[in-house]
């Protein structure tokens, strides 16, 4: 995927339920579905996505980014997919490996690419690799829970202590997400081989790497190079959630700020632009400090990037408040249209979060589960079916 594409981000459990028979797998730890609980599984699956590929194609989508589909056999919160318990297996509540291959094939037949979400920084605590470690050094802090500081800016901070960097990179994301030690050559090989296997097996077109700066820099650089050496046209985007373009640019391939080190990561996520867009369209452009001037001022700083066209740009995603936040604050259709026009025409690779096109609203202050509400019409007997054009806003 590249700047000629429009990525559409889908959380599979919340998009559409095409096969109710796989909603509950009795032998899995979270064996229930409750659509009234935003933190529970809701039953969306790969079949539901495949059934609605024509809808996506008609929107103009050219690439689909799926939140993790690999097995997440965790006791709770397994719907989001970010605590993998088997790197080689699709979660059975979403479908099978064969069904994923079929989805990719069908997407390709309609001119759409498929981007797979992967997580090398951590796995789920129910992963067999953690429950029966090949050796203690497969996980950081010898498998003992030690919380990360989340301060990944320390990686490039010239004033940071070694301890600050270690606790940020080696610390665990949460207690249920043990931190993999990518410096262990066996761990590195396992992760690299698993990603290449999915490329070969399923024919995916790209990878989005979660929590990219939290993993070991050198191993992740080796991985990016290994993949793109084998597949020169393949793209990887790393989640680089940092609050300035200078910090984000450090992680892009051939960054002058990282030299002589090189991440070999072609595409990074432009979180700072997301913040600027969420402010700019709420302000009047009356002086040199606010409104649309924010965007102009920010884009004039693109010289810090090695390749500004390889930035993933977005208004929101599954971890942030939706741009269409709430009725009191930001539900202004003119603001919304302006922002979407800017998103789709600025430099970089535009990404749209599912439901953007039907004005789905959510505030992160009310919990992450509500950022990931069910798409109306994805379940039988939904009172409104937005996959049907007649039920959408003219």
Question: Each predicted region: which residue ranges?
Answer:
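Substrate-binding/active-site clefts of carbohydrate-active enzymes
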Residues: 1-5, 13-202, 220-230, 246-247, ...
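Short, flexible loop/turn elements at secondary-structure junctions
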Residues: 11-14, 70, 91-94, 120, ...
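Generic recognition of stable, solvent-exposed alpha-helical segments in well-folded globular domains
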Residues: 48-51, 98-102, 190, 214-222, ...
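Active-site-proximal helices and loops of the catalytic beta/alpha 8
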Residues: 108, 122, 127-130, 194-196, ...
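Active-site clefts of carbohydrate-active enzymes
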Residues: 176, 305-331
């Amino acid at each position: 995927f590249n700047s000629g594409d429009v990525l559409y981000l889908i959380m599979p459990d919340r998009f559409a339920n095409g096969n109710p028979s796989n909603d509950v797998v009795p032998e899995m730890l979270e064996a229930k579905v409750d659509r009234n609980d935003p933190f529970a599984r809701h039953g969306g699956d790969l079949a539901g996505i495949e059934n609605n590929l024509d809808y996506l194609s008609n929107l103009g989508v050219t690439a689909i980014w799926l939140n993790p589909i690999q097995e997440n056999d965790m006791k709770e919160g397994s719907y989001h997919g970010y605590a993998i318990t088997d790197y080689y297996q699709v979660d059975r509540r979403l479908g099978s490996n064969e069904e994923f291959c079929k989805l990719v094939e069908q997407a390709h037949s309609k001119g759409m690419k498929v981007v797979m979400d992967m997580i090398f920084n951590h796995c789920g605590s129910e992963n067999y690799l953690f429950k029966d470690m090949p050796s203690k050094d497969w996980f950081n802090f010898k498998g003992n829970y030690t919380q990360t500081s989340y301060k990944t800016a320390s990686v490039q901070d010239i004033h940071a202590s070694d301890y600050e960097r270690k606790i940020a990179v080696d610390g665990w994301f949460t207690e249920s997400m043990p931190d993999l030690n990518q410096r262990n050559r066996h761990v590195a090989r396992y992760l690299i081989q698993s990603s290449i296997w999915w490329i070969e097996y399923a024919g995916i077109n790209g990878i989005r790497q979660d929590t990219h700066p939290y993993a070991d820099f050198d191993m992740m650089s080796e991985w990016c190079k290994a993949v793109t050496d084998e597949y020169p046209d393949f793209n990887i985007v790393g989640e680089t959630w940092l609050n300035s373009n200078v910090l984000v640019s450090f992680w892009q391939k051939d960054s002058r700020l990282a030299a002589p080190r090189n991440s070999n990561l072609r595409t990074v996520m432009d979180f700072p632009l997301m913040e600027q867009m969420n402010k700019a369209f709420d302000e009047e452009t009356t002086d040199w400090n606010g409104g649309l001037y924010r965007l102009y001022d920010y884009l004039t700083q693109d010289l810090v990037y090695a390749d500004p066209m390889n930035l993933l740009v977005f208004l929101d995603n599954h971890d942030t408040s939706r741009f269409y936040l709430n009725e009191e604050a930001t539900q202004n259709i003119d603001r919304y249209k302006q922002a979407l026009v800017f998103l789709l025409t600025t430099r970089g690779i535009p990404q749209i979060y599912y439901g953007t096109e039907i004005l789905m609203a959510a505030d992160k202050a009310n919990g992450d589960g509500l950022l990931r509400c069910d798409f109306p019409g994805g379940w039988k007997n939904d009172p409104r079916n937005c996959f049907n054009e007649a039920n959408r806003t003219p």
